[in-house]
Each structure stands twice: as C-alpha cells, then as structure tokens.
Amino acid sequence: MNNLVILPILIPFIVGSFLILFAKHHSLQRVISGFAVVGMLLVSIYLAVDVYQNGITVLELGNWQAPFGIVLVADLFATMMVILASIVGVVCLFFAFQTISSEREKYYFYPFYFFLLAGVNGAFLTGDLFNLFVFFEVMLIASYILIVLGGTKYQLRESLKYVVINVFASILFIVGVAYIYSITGTLNMADLAVKVGELEQTGVLNVIAVIFLVVFAMKGGLFPLYFWLPRSYFGPPAAIAALFGGLLTKVGIYAIMRTFTLIFNHDPGFTHTLILILAGLTMFFGVLGAVSQFDFKRILSYHIISQVGYMVMGLGIYTQLAIAGAIYYIAHHIIVKAALFLFAGATQRITGTTDLKKMGGLLKTHPWLAWMFFISAISLAGIPPLSGFFSKFALILAAFLNENYIIAAVALAVGLLTLFSMMKIFIYAFWGEQKHTEEQANFKVGKLLLPIVPLVALTIILGFAAEPIFQYSLQVADQILDPTIYIESVLKE
C-alpha cells in the first residue's frame, strides 16, 4: 500500500514524458491527458482515504531507511493538498480543451501541464528539504514554459519578472539548505525536527528560519515580495491562469506551514509573530490593489495576494483553531480562485476583453454564467452560508481568543473590501446595459461552463457541509501541531 504514495507524482511525470512523443497529434494528446488526469484524481482520493483510515503512510525509495534515504510522506495535510491539486488539474485541463489554441498545443502545452502537476504533488509529498527544492524547480520550469506559451509581447515582458524572482528564490533556497545542513547534518524533515529541537543556537536557527520564510514568501506571494504576481498571472490564457492562481502560491504557503510547524517551531515568539505581521500587511496591501483595479483578471490576481494573508494568519496565531481555520481556508480558496479565473476566461471569450468598463449586461444574455460567478464571488468575500464565511470566522475567532485584535480587525476590513471589489466586477460585467454585439450575446457558453460547474458545486458543499469539513480540518491541525506524530512515522522511533 505504501507504493500508492508515489503515484500522484509518477502518473503526471510519465504521462508528460509520453505526450512529448505525440506533440503533433493534438486529439490523441487530449484523450490521453483527459484519462490520465482523472486517473490521478482517483488515485489521490484513494490515497487520502487510506491515510485517513490507517494513519501516515511513508514510502522509503530504494528501501533506504530515513533519514539516510529519500522518503515520501503522506499525512492528512499532504493528501488533502494532493486531492485539491488533482481537482483543479482536472477542471483546468477540460477548460483548456475548449479554449487553448492549436498554436499553444503544438508547443508542448500538455506535457508541461503534467510536469507542473508532478512538481506540485511532489512538493506536497516529499519528506526532505532538498527534494522539496527539486520539486519546486520541476514545477517552476514547467510554469516558465506555460506562462510564455503564445509568445505575446506582454507575456514575455511580464514572465521575465516571474523567472527572475523565482531564480533568485531558488538560489536563496539552496543557501538555506546548505546552511541548515551545515549545523544539523541532515535534510530529512523529521530528522531536522529532532535535531533542531536539540540545538541551543536560537539566533542561528532564527536566521535560517528567516531565509526559508523569504524563499517561501516569494513563491507564495507574501508582502512585500508579491510584486511579480498580478502582471504575471494576467498574461496567460484562463486555463493556465486558473491553474497558477489555484495552485502555485499554495505550494509556497504549504511549505511555510509544513516547515514552521515541524522544523522552525523553536522560537514562535519571534518566527510566528513575524509571520502574523506579514499576514496582516499581505492582506491589506493585496486588497488595496484589487480595489484600485478595473480589470477582471487583475482584480483576481491581487486577491490571490490578499487571500494568502488569511492562510498564514492562522499559522501566525498558532493555535489549533487558527490552524484548522487556515486549512479550511486553503481548501476553500483553491477551489474558488480556480473557478473565478475560469469565469474571467469565459467572459473574455464572450466580450473579447477583461476591461470591466467595456463590459455590461451579461446577466441578461448569459444568466447561468452570471449567477455561478456571483456564488463564487460572495464565497470569496466570506458571505454565509458559503465556505469563505466559515473559514474566515474560525480565523477571526481564533484571533480574538488569542487577543490578536489588530489582525482580527484587518481580516474583517479586508473581507469587506473583498466584497466591494467582487461586487464591482458583478455590477460592471454582468449588470447594466449590454455593451457586447449580437454575435457575442448569442455566444454558446455552455461548454465553457461545464468544467466550472464542479468547482461551484464544491464551493457550495464546502459551506453547507461546514461541520464535517471543519472537524477534518481540526484533525489536520492536531496532526501538524504535534510533530512527534510525523517524526515517529518517518523515523519509526
């Protein structure tokens, strides 16, 4: 059963490699891709059920026992993230079938799509820091290709910033890996948790912790290192933007939550207070960017920034309720954000623009599109009874219980500004007078909406099934707040 752990990585990697051989056969690529991504989702669900029933699953590659060999570790948090990545992978791929041009398909869109999923799943499942770096690079190299597909001037200019900032982050990552190896002699996360706990060099460990925080903050889009994100995510087609918006920043957030609950928990008075400050600044400046925009995709891009602030807010508060709220919020945000980017793509196909001032009246001509967007928008803003409300409520309640009143006030204010900016999209794009042509009004949007329906349905389910989902989030929080569970499973102590 342990071999199941590698399948969410192996399936997309093998499929991506295989699809390179059929670069000119687009129809065949679509068929293979469709079956493969659904298969990956089914395997991910099976793995998650197994871990939930039987506990943490560890795969020692080559039968080299940890901490000496490479290990893959599937716990509740990792398997949840793998399932979410697979869901977004399925939906975005089927949306791409409708929207990606043959020009982009012939330049290896499908192979690199799967390589990116392999990197994402690998980052969630790896049990050591060096292979976390390796999977980050697999993911990022694939994203470099996907972000420039089409080769427009805007894409190339903005993707250069994306590449430069991530190359710098990768260099800093290696520096951090070398630094922590030099004082502990290991890179296995479970072994690091043990050895860091035995060290009395708090100052040195804090420096290393800050290095890793900067690295993951660059990749996760935290203040003040988010400047690359809004314009980089504006250029690619909607399917790619949705994949990036739903997943890529969450890999950075996952890495922060994993390392700062397992390894760098030696001085929470310093590290987690710093994280809490960054969370507040990220939320505030991200939502200000969203409020100031009048472009559909740019508003959504800035909201990625503001919303990751909520996720690390839970880590900064560092209580069971706060971590559970953050876990719930991550699941909510991945689903909702992917849906919203796909809605942006659908409206762009109808109107030919993402400029809100050039839109209007879509509610009359495309009511299903309008109301499905509305559900996702108010969920993002945190309106009950949808998923955004319950996750934000848990985070804000945790802040009040922990007497973190300032961050609670920031979270409430950001929620109101999020609602304002999302209603601005709804009013400009869907309300008012029709500004598109008769041909655009008659555009058949059904095929585009079909892949988005599961995401909207999940958004509703995550809200109406809040009780069992929050109980699961509490279980995840209990597991990651008790490092001994992870350590004993990996090191078999």
From Swiss-Prot:
Principal location class: membrane
Keyword presence, Cell membrane: yes
Family matches, as Pfam families: Proton_antipo_M
InterPro entries the record matches: CPA3_Na-H_Antiporter_D, NADH_UbQ_OxRdtase, ND/Mrp_TM
GO cellular component: plasma membrane
Keywords: Antiport, Cell membrane, Hydrogen ion transport, Ion transport, Membrane, Sodium, Sodium transport, Transmembrane, Transmembrane helix, Transport
Localization of this protein: Cell membrane
tRNA-binding recorded as keyword: no
Ranges that cross the membrane: 4-23, 30-52, 72-94, 107-126, 130-149, 162-184, 204-226, 233-255, 270-292, 299-321, 325-347, 368-390, 405-427, 448-470
Gene Ontology molecular function, alphabetical: antiporter activity; NADH dehydrogenase (ubiquinone) activity
Subunit and partners: Forms a heterooligomeric complex that consists of seven subunits: MrpA, MrpB, MrpC, MrpD, MrpE, MrpF and MrpG.
Role: Mnh complex is a Na(+)Li(+)/H(+) antiporter involved in Na(+) and/or Li(+) excretion and Na(+) resistance. Na(+)/H(+) antiport consumes a transmembrane electrical potential, and is thus inferred to be electrogenic. Does not transport K(+), Ca(2+) or Mg(2+). Mrp complex is a Na(+)/H(+) antiporter involved in Na(+) excretion and Na(+) resistance.
PANTHER family for this protein: NA(+)_H(+) ANTIPORTER SUBUNIT D1, NADH DEHYDROGENASE
Family according to the record: Belongs to the CPA3 antiporters (TC 2.A.63) subunit D family.
Note: Mrp-dependent antiport apparently occurs by a secondary, proton motive force-dependent mechanism, but the similarity of several Mrp proteins to membrane-embedded subunits of energy-coupled NADH dehydrogenase complexes raises the possibility that there is a capacity for electron transport that could provide a primary energy coupling option for Mrp functions.
Protein name: Na(+)/H(+) antiporter subunit D
Species this protein is from: Alkalihalophilus pseudofirmus (strain ATCC BAA-2126 / JCM 17055 / OF4)
